[in-house]
A protein has these predicted regions:
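Intrinsic-disorder/low-complexity, polar/charged segments enriched in Ser/Thr/Lys/Arg/Asp/Glu/Gln
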Residues: 2-8, 48, 62, 75, ...
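Glycine-rich portal/gate segments that line the openings of hydrophobic small-molecule binding cavities
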Residues: 30, 39-84, 135-152
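Solvent-exposed residues in well-ordered beta-strands and their adjoining turns
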Residues: 10-14, 52-56, 68, 93-95, ...
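Hydrophobic ligand-binding cavity/cleft-lining segments
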Residues: 1-45, 152
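A short, structured loop/turn motif at beta-sheet edges
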Residues: 12-15, 40-45, 68-73, 91-100
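Beta-strand/loop substructures that line and gate deep hydrophobic ligand-binding cavities in soluble
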Residues: 79-134, 151
Length: 152
């Protein structure tokens, strides 16, 4: 079962401020407590991010995110592999009151537990996926409103 998403989130800062925040990969766990482990060098083409995600369901998801396209202030595309595989794309556009983050993904479970869950309870699998997206966007917006802390 493939889960395809196309979500849009209004954020309270302009594209430059958002980009400055997401470039600080060492800070991701500050606003995403469900990101249990995260290893990334930078937001640049060719980088491979290793992630352990704690979903709202009782399991961890381990993935590698390989950045395939990075267009500063506008776009990030990636290939996802591991427990879940597929593609993801973030697009940033300006708005009068901040910016919009569009998150598009097409992902399928590869780990047997997750494949089984998606097969017998597709609504539960979609809930877990959407929870990570929506909660993550909300936590990022909250972090942006508070103003990022720490070194650039």
């Amino acid at each position: 079962m493939e889960i395809t998403s196309d979500r849009r989130y209004a954020l309270p800062v302009d594209a430059q401020a958002l980009w400055s925040t997401i470039e600080r990969t060492h800070s991701y766990q500050d606003w995403w407590p469900w990101l249990r482990a995260f290893d990334a060098e930078a937001l640049r083409v060719g980088d491979r991010w290793r992630c352990v995600i704690r979903s709202p369901l009782p399991y961890l998801v381990r993935v590698t995110v390989a950045l395939s396209e990075v267009d500063r202030l506008h776009l990030v595309s990636a290939q996802v592999s591991g427990d879940i595989e597929g593609t993801a794309r973030l697009t940033i556009s300006e708005r009068p009151d901040g910016c919009e983050l569009r998150v598009e993904s097409s992902l399928a479970p590869k780990r047997p537990l997750l494949r089984g869950l998606a097969r017998v309870a597709p609504g539960v699998a979609r809930f877990g996926h959407e929870w990570v997206l929506d909660t993550g966007a909300g936590q990022l917006a909250e972090y942006l409103r508070a103003g990022p802390k720490g070194p650039p």
